[in-house]
Every structure is written in structure tokens, then in C-alpha cells.
């Protein structure tokens, strides 16, 4: 899947392709966060946008025949990129909401998403029952047999069809999203760079309640009768990733009751995470969320009493333990936050293991330690007799090795704007893809240049004067 961004915040033009592991590096204030938030916002909102795009087409087909059905082949075969164009056009119009920014800041923005090859959805099997409550009566059934292009809709309660919101049309749209579009657009979780503050102040932060009180106070009696006006006024003053991080950590006591499919199938990965933080997160009755350091005699600590590294990894830890599943996209803004270089290396190895069990990872980083460790995992993947001996000597596992074909790294940079017949003009902020060598790993110029400058200065200090 390829993304093209134009005039999105500090990014003038950028093209990025998501692979199993996608990394963005670059200096401060060069647009990394704009790329990250823009991609996250689309992957967070595409299902609701798709409902608007498909509503009229679905309603037309539900009115035909005793057993209405949707011919998915007729609607979508060979047309996925056309629909993605419609989705991104609508999404671009809500970028100010995604970033909690002034609308004029994104007035010239465009985003394009394309896929190279469509997947065949005909072999997919699908079945979903819609009930009035978890144990209640069935209102409708949506089904698609493997080998058939037809999504059949059996309605037991006609009232469901006439609902303006949350009715049958929305359920059909969700089914189409699962069958046709979800293979390209993964469920996404983000850990923003503001996650440390969200962890320590999570009890004090309630965006939903704050927005409600502010909205109620700003509307008159007539406007309060309009639910859409109320929702409009309740828009948060925070970017979606920050807002979602806060909402997630505020629910940890409830989320803790769930075990993710990743934790069930690969418990060794949650153990590896616990080794990084030197303990584990626990929810204790009457005490709530605590951090339990490893060791029988160690006291339990609240989040305010815990180290910054424990707080920085809180949401990632609960995501892995309670939400993660194969096919997800995990986005991490600066995974190295508050981590000692030793733990940065350990986190790089955990990220590689996540990639190898089917979780895609997208991250921004300033950490040379993290990149060097990923390079080690790429170099060890050559599996020569020599590298296998090194792997065994230093305790690397086979499930930590990285296939370079599944990795891409982009660096923020500037380039001259090219205008036909007018020569080069103003500088543009963009992304440049790094070269990846099977035997040497990733070339990251943004780190290499700084390190070489420092080494040169120190060499001059040590060897440049009179002895």
C-alpha cells in the first residue's frame, strides 16, 4: 500500500510504502509526526467514511427482492483504487480534526492511497448475526459463502432497515469493509510521543467529559436539541493519536480483563516485554493499576512512583497483552523514549519478533542504537556459517532475524522544487528512502553524518595538536 502526501503540515511532498517494518528518521521539525498522524488518522477513520460512500448504493440494493443481496464482484472488482480515491478525498477534508488544527493549515493538502494488486475476495467466507442484545433475538443475518460474490442479507426485523443511524445499512457496510477492504487497511494502534504524560495523569484526563461540559456551556437551549450541533461542539482540542492514547490508558482496568490472541499464541513475547520493563503491570482490586518490579521483596508502585521508562511503555504493554493480533499495524512514535541503550536494543529485538509473527510495525526514531540493532538482525539473516556462529555466541534467536525485503526506512530531507521550464525554486520538505544492504543493513545518513562530525571533532582534539 502506497501513500502520497502533498502539503500536509511541514511535509511538502512525500511518498511512502508500508512494509512489515516501516521506519521514519530525520531531524526535529522536519515532518515525521505529520506523516505518522496523517496515516494513522486515515486508518482510524476509513470504516466510518466508507459507510457514507456506500450508503446510497447499499440502500438501493436492500430494497430489491425478498432476499436482498449485494454483488460484491459487480461493485468492487477492479475498482479498489477508485474507492480509495473517494475515501481519501473525504478524509483530506477532515485533516483539521485529525490534527486539532486550524482548517486553513490544510487547505491545500492532498492525500492519495493506492494498491498495486487487488486481492481476490471471492474465496472469503463471512457470517455475522445482528442481535438486539448479546443474548437476545436475531434481527438480521449477513452471510457470504466461499466461492460466491454475493453478500446475502436475511432480515427478521423490518424496523432495523428503517433506522437512520446504526441500522442495517451500517452493518452491511461493516461486512463489506471486512471482506473487501480490511486486507489492505489493518486495524491500527498508536503510541504517541505524549504517552508518558498520559500514563501519569490518566485519572485526571477525561477528554470526553471535558468536551461534554464545554459543549453544554457553549450552546443555547435551541441548539441543545440538535444532536449534530452538540457533537460538532464536542470536537476535541487534541490530535487524534493523543486523544486515543489518553482514552486507552483511562480504560486499562477494564482492558486488563481481556487476553489478546497474540498473548495466547505467543506468550513468550509478553515475557520479553516484561523483561524490558523489569517487571509487569498489574490491576489490583482496591488499588487499581500498579507496576510490580521483578523480585519477591519488591514493593508495588503506582504510575507516579514508577520510572519514566515504565510509564513510556505502558500503553504498548497493554496493547500487546490485551489487544494485539496478527495483521494489526502498531505505530510507535519514538520507541526509545526514556530507555537506556541496553533496553533500546532489547526493544528492537522485540519489534523484530512482532514483525515475524504477523504484526506490522511503523515507527519514527532518533535512536542510532535501535537502528544498529535492527541492522544486526538484518545482517544475521544472511545465515552464513560465520553469522550463525555469531548469532549463537551472542544469544540471538531465529525468530528475531529480519528479512531486509520486509523492511523500509525513510529519511526526512529537503530538495529543490522542480518546475518545468523555470528551474529550481524553493526548498521542499520530503522523504527519501534509504538503501538496505543484505550484508550491511540500513544506511541512515541522518545519524551517520552527525556521528562522523562528532568523531572528527574528537579526533582533532586528540591528535590535531602538538604532542
PLM features per residue range, with description:
Residues 258-280:
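Amphipathic alpha-helical domain-onset/packing element
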Residues 224-246, 256:
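Polybasic, proline/glycine-rich intrinsically disordered low-complexity segments
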Residues 327-329, 358-362:
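Loop/turn-to-beta-strand initiation segments
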Residues 364-366:
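H-loop/switch region of ABC-family ATPase nucleotide-binding domains
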Residues 190-192, 401-413:
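Extended hydrophobic secondary-structure segments that form protein cores and membrane-embedded regions
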Amino acid at each position: 500500500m502506497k501513500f502520497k502526501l502533498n502539503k500536509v503540515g511541514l511535509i511538502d511532498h512525500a511518498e511512502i510504502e508500508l512494509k512489515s517494518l516501516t521506519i521514519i528518521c530525520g531531524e526535529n521539525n522536519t515532518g515525521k509526526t505529520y506523516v505518522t498522524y496523517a496515516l494513522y488518522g486515515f486508518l482510524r477513520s476509513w470504516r466510518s467514511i466508507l459507510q457514507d460512500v456506500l450508503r446510497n448504493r447499499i440502500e438501493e440494493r436492500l430494497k430489491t427482492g425478498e432476499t436482498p443481496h449485494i454483488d460484491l464482484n459487480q461493485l468492487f472488482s477492479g475498482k479498489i483504487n477508485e474507492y480509495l480515491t473517494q475515501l481519501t478525498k473525504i478524509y483530506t477534508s477532515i485533516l483539521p480534526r485529525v490534527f486539532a488544527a486550524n482548517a486553513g493549515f490544510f487547505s491545500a493538502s492532498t492525500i492519495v492511497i493506492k494498491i498495486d494488486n487487488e486481492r481476490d475476495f471471492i474465496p472469503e467466507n463471512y457470517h455475522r448475526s445482528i442481535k438486539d442484545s448479546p443474548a437476545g433475538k436475531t434481527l438480521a443475518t449477513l452471510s457470504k459463502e466461499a466461492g460466491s460474490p454475493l453478500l446475502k442479507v436475511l432480515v427478521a426485523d423490518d424496523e432495523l432497515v428503517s433506522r437512520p443511524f446504526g441500522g442495517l445499512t451500517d452493518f452491511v457496510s461493516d461486512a463489506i469493509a471486512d471482506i473487501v477492504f480490511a486486507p489492505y487497511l489493518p486495524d491500527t494502534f498508536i503510541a504517541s510521543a505524549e504517552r508518558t504524560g498520559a500514563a501519569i495523569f490518566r485519572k485526571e484526563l477525561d477528554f470526553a467529559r471535558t468536551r461534554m461540559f464545554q459543549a453544554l456551556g457553549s450552546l443555547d437551549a435551541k441548539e441543545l436539541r440538535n444532536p449534530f450541533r452538540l457533537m460538532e461542539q464536542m470536537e476535541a482540542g487534541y490530535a487524534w493519536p493523543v486523544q486515543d492514547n489518553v482514552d486507552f490508558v483511562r480504560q486499562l482496568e477494564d482492558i486488563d480483563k481481556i487476553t489478546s490472541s497474540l498473548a495466547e499464541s505467543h506468550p513468550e513475547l509478553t515475557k520479553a516485554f516484561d523483561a524490558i520493563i523489569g517487571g509487569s503491570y498489574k490491576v489490583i482490586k482496591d488499588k487499581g493499576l500498579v507496576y510490580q518490579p521483578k523480585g519477591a521483596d519488591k514493593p508495588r508502585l503506582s504510575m507516579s512512583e514508577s520510572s519514566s521508562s515504565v510509564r513510556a511503555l505502558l500503553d504498548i504493554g497493554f496493547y500487546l497483552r490485551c489487544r494485539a493480533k496478527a495483521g494489526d499495524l502498531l505505530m510507535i512514535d519514538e520507541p526509545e523514549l526514556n530507555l537506556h541503550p541496553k533496553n533500546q536494543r532489547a526493544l528492537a529485538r522485540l519489534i523484530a519478533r512482532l514483525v515475524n509473527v504477523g504484526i506490522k510495525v511503523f515507527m519514527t526514531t532518533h535512536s542510532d542504537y535501535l537502528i544498529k540493532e535492527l541492522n544486526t538482525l538484518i545482517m544475521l539473516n544472511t545465515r552464513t556459517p560465520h553469522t550463525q556462529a555469531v548469532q549463537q555466541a551472542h544469544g540471538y534467536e531465529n525468530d528475531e532475524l529480519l528479512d531486509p525485503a520486509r523492511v523500509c526506512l525513510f529519511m526526512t530531507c529537503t530538495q529543490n522544487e522542480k518546475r518545468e521550464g523555470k528551474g529550481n525554486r524553493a526548498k521542499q520538505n520530503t522523504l527519501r528512502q534509504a538503501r538496505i544492504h543484505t550484508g550491511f543493513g540500513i544506511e541512515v545518513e541522518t545519524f551517520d553524518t552527525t556521528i562522523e562530525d562528532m568523531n572528527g571533532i574528537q579526533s582533532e582534539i586528540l591528535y590535531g595538536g602538538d604532542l
